[in-house]
């Protein structure tokens, strides 16, 4: 199950070893070229002790489909585990842009997350349905910016702790926070997926990025390693 496995990691309930096993199972049993399925195999016999999900057609919606909304939780979970390559693999699979060359199968716009995509247990595997009718866009933005790019605002500190593919050498972003603007440059000279070696704020090495005066602009450089 996607949700329980991802949240075992995100909640901190699983230690790193068990968390990796949980997410390895997601990759092994639930990952598809269109994204991650909710569960596998799909329920095929109604069971009132389990509930409504067992009465949904196999591979559709809550029963074994690639339900878009919880997919970004898996990206975030992999970032917690420090596995940027897999987080990007999961991100790319669900991304509508990368499914545009499969439009005859997907049957939906290449600029909208859909509520769900038919899972492997359905004869129309890969067909997307209910574009825009989903909270997936918000969760995709949340997981991509706060976990993959690692830019996380807190009450009195701006955390920057990226988890990216090992072959990413650099990236940049602009983040407005508490009325100030931060021009962020991240470099990855050693080709790591996670870990911060140095933080520079306006060309001064610092341990953290505190709140800055509203209306000001600041340069931030993060060296991974």
Regions found by a protein language model. Give the residues of each.
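Extended ligand-binding clefts on enzyme/binding-domain cores
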Residues: 1-47
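Well-ordered alpha-helical segments within folded domains of soluble proteins
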Residues: 1-12, 19, 23, 64-79, ...
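Non-catalytic C-terminal accessory modules of carbohydrate-active enzymes
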Residues: 28-32, 43-45, 55-63, 73-225
């Amino acid at each position: 199950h996607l949700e329980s496995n991802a949240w075992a990691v995100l909640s901190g309930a699983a230690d790193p070893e068990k968390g990796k096993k949980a997410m390895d199972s997601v990759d092994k049993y639930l990952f598809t070229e269109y994204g991650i399925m909710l569960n596998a195999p799909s329920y095929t016999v109604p069971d009132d002790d389990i509930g409504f999900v067992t009465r949904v057609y196999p591979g559709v919606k809550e029963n074994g489909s690639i339900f878009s909304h919880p997919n970004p939780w898996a990206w975030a979970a992999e970032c917690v585990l420090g596995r940027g390559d897999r987080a990007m693999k999961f991100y790319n699979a669900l991304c509508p842009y990368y499914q545009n060359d499969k439009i005859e199968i997907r049957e939906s716009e290449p600029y909208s997350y859909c509520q769900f995509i038919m899972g492997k247990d359905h004869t129309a595997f890969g067909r997307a349905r209910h574009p825009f009718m989903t909270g997936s866009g918000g969760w995709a933005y949340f997981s991509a910016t706060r976990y993959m790019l690692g830019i996380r605002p807190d009450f009195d500190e701006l955390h920057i702790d990226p988890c990216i593919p090992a072959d990413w050498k650099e990236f940049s972003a602009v983040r407005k926070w508490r009325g100030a603007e931060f021009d962020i440059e991240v470099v990855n000279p050693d080709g790591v997926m996670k870990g911060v070696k140095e933080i520079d704020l306006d060309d001064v090495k610092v341990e953290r990025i505190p709140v800055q005066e509203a209306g000001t602009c600041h340069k931030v450089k993060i060296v991974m390693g």
